[in-house]
Structure formats: C-alpha cells, structure tokens
Amino acid sequence: MSANALGMIIFAYLCGSISSAILICRLARLPDPRKFGSGNPGATNVLRIGGKLAAASVLICDVLKGMIPVWLAYYLNVPPFYLGIVAIAACLGHIYPVFFHFKGGKGVATAFGSIAAIGWDLSGLIAGTWLLTVLLSGYSSLGAIISALLAPFYVWWFKPEFTYPVALLSCLVLYRHHDNIQRLWRGQESRIWHKLKKKTEKTDKEIIQEAKEQEKED
C-alpha cells in the first residue's frame, strides 16, 4: 500500500466521522437525531424531525463525505482496489464516527456518494433503483436495501475492477439495516409518506417537547 492510499483511507474515515445530521440539527436548533425519532442520525430521520430543508442539507453533506475522498484518491492515482477501500473507510466513519462516540448513521448516502465518484452511470442506476422502490413501496429503508443488493451487479457490468470493494460496501449497508429488515418482515416499518404527514401535523414546539420527554425517559 502506498503512502497516498493510506493517507486517503485515513482522510476518508475522518471525513465520514463528521456527522452532518447532528451538526445541522444543532445549528437549526432541532432535537438531537440520536435521541428522537428512529435514533438514526441520517437524512430520513432528520426529515421526520426537521422537515425537507434540513433533511436535504444532511443528504447533500453525507453524499459529499463519500464523494470528495474518492475523487481526491482518484486524482492521486490510487489503484482501483484501494479506491474502493477509501470508499469503505468513508462509510465506516459515517457509521462509527470518532468525533461522536462511534454512534453514527447507516451509510447509505455516503456509500452513494462514493459510488458516484466512481461513475455517474452507476450512481444514476442506483438512484433510479432507490427512487423506483420508494415510489412503489413507500419505504425508504427498502429502497436502500434493494439498491445495496443490486449495486455490486451494476458495478460488475460497467466497471468490474470495483466489484469486490463495492460488494463489501453493500454488505456494510445491509448489516446496518438489519433492524429495518426485521421491521419490514413484521410489517412494522413506517412509510416515508407517513413521516411527512406526521411532520406537517405537528408544530415545532410539539416536536421539541416530544424530544425532551423522550430524553427524560432515556
């Protein structure tokens, strides 16, 4: 392993460790996403507690956390295999952030950003798969699961040199969704449309009050 590859792997992990969901919620004076809603510091949970603008901001930042390190590694001529390891490091940082007590999100947006840096054709297929699944089912988590399952096949078809690291990345995302898989199986997973409806029916004061009550229970 070259010094460039090792340096980019470390850099990617540190970038991933910056939890945009937590920071944006603090800036917007919203409840801590780790203690409210699903407890997951990601864009979907921020959508539940903070609305579309906050969720979109989190989504963009999470995508960039994966995209920027992989792009930089590519321009530093890091070999394809280690380029994939850089992508995995960014996702590991998002999932186990060193700056936030190793309690992070599920890595979907960061994984998407990493793959987008490898090829826009791949990112288009994955985004289309997620969107189609969500539109048909209403489940954001199911969209992530189906996309993670199909991503290695898309990569194998277009850029086979990245198949192995992307397969590892997909396994990581699927592992982080094991609770969602169980809830989907039991029919207990909430649909994304339900989250939006609940958000519009509540005032900001009610949301913050619920967060405080949940913190007391914890």
From Swiss-Prot:
The chain crosses the membrane at residues 5-25, 53-73, 80-100, 115-135, 138-158. GO terms for biological process: phospholipid biosynthetic process. Pathway: Lipid metabolism; phospholipid metabolism. SMART domains: G3P_acyltransf. It is found in: Cell inner membrane. One of its GO terms (molecular function) is acyl-phosphate glycerol-3-phosphate acyltransferase activity. It catalyses: an acyl phosphate + sn-glycerol 3-phosphate = a 1-acyl-sn-glycero-3-phosphate + phosphate. Its EC number is 2.3.1.275. InterPro entries: G3P_acylTferase_PlsY (IPR003811). Keywords: Cell inner membrane, Cell membrane, Lipid biosynthesis, Lipid metabolism, Membrane, Phospholipid biosynthesis, Phospholipid metabolism, Transferase, Transmembrane, Transmembrane helix. Belongs to the PlsY family. Catalyzes the transfer of an acyl group from acyl-phosphate (acyl-PO(4)) to glycerol-3-phosphate (G3P) to form lysophosphatidic acid (LPA). This enzyme utilizes acyl-phosphate as fatty acyl donor, but not acyl-CoA or acyl-ACP. HAMAP family: PlsY. Probably interacts with PlsX. This is Glycerol-3-phosphate acyltransferase. The lineage of its organism: Bacteria, Pseudomonadati, Pseudomonadota, Gammaproteobacteria, Enterobacterales.
